[in-house]
């Protein structure tokens, strides 16, 4: 049996009043526009065998729509008051599992798709965690500026570590922009829905852990040429014989900034470093 509540704004207003929820705590901005909710669900291409993860389930507007179309919804919520709302609404719904906890700390169960209005304050951390988890499709709401960074291109101001990390794991595209007015209470900025489709890495990476560390390091020095960015962050990268290694890296790339290089070019530099480290270590052993 599904909740007797219907509608968007009226549902949220009644629940906020009933449970004395002030809004704003735990990054609470509930998507209430039925049109956008329906478009998000449609974009997920849900089927009766799907297991769907929802992070930041809130009062359950999206949860309810998802549960009507899939085998199971796993709804994670941190706020104990909202957890109580979800239990009150859905304890009699057999295909909704409610997990009370911090999505950054909870070990995700197996799922096929993730459909969520993500808490904006943890956008980076939760995205990096999700990208390392196996799933088929993600339909995710972010602040618009964050979404723009995910799909940016080299030489653009939004191009960042997040762009490269996203590109490494998945194809990403912005499906729709969502205005502040679609939420209750309204956030200060507009939002966007991103479609994430995981796929094999589209370029060679010889050491994933080093590549990710390398990207993080050089983008922390995004205004520096790559040569100086590597030198300045070698306390993180721990490259032996760093000056010799840099002298043997491609000059055309060393004279550019991280923000000027494609993800594949950054991978090529990281691969060169791995090869040089191996070569230097081998020479030292033979001496």
Swiss-Prot record:
A GO cellular-component term linked to this record: cytoplasm
Keywords tagged on the record: Cytoplasm, Methyltransferase, RNA-binding, rRNA processing, S-adenosyl-L-methionine, Transferase
A molecular function (GO) term: RNA binding
Cleaved signal peptide residues: none
The enzyme's E.C. designation: 2.1.1.-
Residues binding S-adenosyl-L-methionine, per UniProt: 29, 31, 56, 77, 102, 117
Broad class of the protein's primary localization: cytoplasm
Entry keyword Hydrolase: no
Subcellular location: Cytoplasm
Pfam families: RrnaAD
Protein family per UniProt: Belongs to the class I-like SAM-binding methyltransferase superfamily. rRNA adenine N(6)-methyltransferase family. RsmA subfamily.
NCBIfam families: ksgA
Described purpose of this protein according to its UniProt entry: Specifically dimethylates two adjacent adenosines in the loop of a conserved hairpin near the 3'-end of 16S rRNA in the 30S particle. May play a critical role in biogenesis of 30S subunits.
The protein, known as: Probable ribosomal RNA small subunit methyltransferase A
Lineage of producing organism: Archaea, Methanobacteriati, Methanobacteriota, Stenosarchaea group, Methanomicrobia
């Amino acid at each position: 049996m599904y909740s007797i509540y219907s509608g968007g704004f009226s549902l949220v207003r009644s629940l906020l009043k009933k449970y004395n929820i002030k809004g704003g705590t735990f990054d609470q901005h509930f998507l209430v526009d039925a049109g956008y909710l329906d478009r998000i669900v449609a974009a997920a291409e849900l089927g009766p065998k799907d297991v769907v993860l929802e992070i930041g389930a809130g009062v359950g507007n999206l949860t309810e729509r998802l549960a009507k179309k899939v085998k199971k919804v796993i709804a994670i919520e941190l706020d104990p008051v909202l957890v109580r709302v979800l239990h009150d609404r859905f304890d009699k719904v057999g295909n909704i599992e409610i997990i009370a906890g911090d999505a950054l700390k909870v070990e995700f169960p197996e799922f096929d798709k993730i459909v969520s209005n993500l808490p904006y304050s943890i956008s980076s951390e939760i995205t990096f965690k999700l990208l390392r988890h196996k799933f088929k499709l993600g339909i995710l709401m972010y602040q618009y500026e964050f979404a723009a960074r995910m799909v940016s291109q080299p030489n653009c101001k939004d191009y960042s570590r997040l762009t490269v990390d996203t590109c490494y794991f998945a194809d990403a595209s912005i499906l729709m922009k969502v205005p502040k007015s679609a939420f209750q209470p309204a956030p200060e900025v507009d939002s966007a829905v991103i479609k994430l489709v995981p796929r094999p890495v589209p370029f060679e990476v010889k050491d994933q852990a080093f590549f990710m560390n390398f990207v993080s390091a050089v983008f922390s020095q995004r205004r520096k040429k790559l040569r100086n960015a590597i030198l300045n962050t070698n306390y993180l990268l721990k490259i032996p014989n760093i000056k010799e290694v840099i002298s043997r890296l491609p000059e055309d790339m060393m004279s550019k900034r991280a923000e000027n290089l494609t993800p594949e070019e950054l991978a090529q530099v990281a691969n060169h470093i791995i090869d040089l480290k191996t070569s230097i270590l081998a020479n030292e052993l033979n001496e």
